Amino acid sequence: MWPVLWTVVRTYAPYVTFPVAFVVGAVGYHLEWFIRGKDPQPVEEEKSISERREDRKLDELLGKDHTQVVSLKDKLEFAPKAVLNRNRPEKN
């Protein structure tokens, strides 16, 4: 009798396993929901570091007057003089 029963269970295992697993999962899901109770209020997520940096940079840009810029003539040379004149004696 047992060998016949095991043969039947082995043959029809895929057809029996899914409904049993479905019922067990549904019961477990509802039991967990019942024990836990209501869902807590969602917590507002903090901004990431990059988002805070972007906000800070935007705030800094809003406070500046972009029409007042330094002219190209007033800017320093491309390379500092110390690099170019390192081995040359100073001109007086």
UniProtKB/Swiss-Prot annotation:
Keywords: Membrane, Transmembrane, Transmembrane helix. Pfam families: UPF0767 (PF15990). It comes from the Eukaryota. GO terms for cellular component: membrane. The chain crosses the membrane at residues 15-34. It is a single-pass membrane protein. It is found in: Membrane. The keyword Transmembrane applies. Its main location: membrane. The keyword rRNA-binding does not apply. Belongs to the SMIM12 family. This is Small integral membrane protein 12.
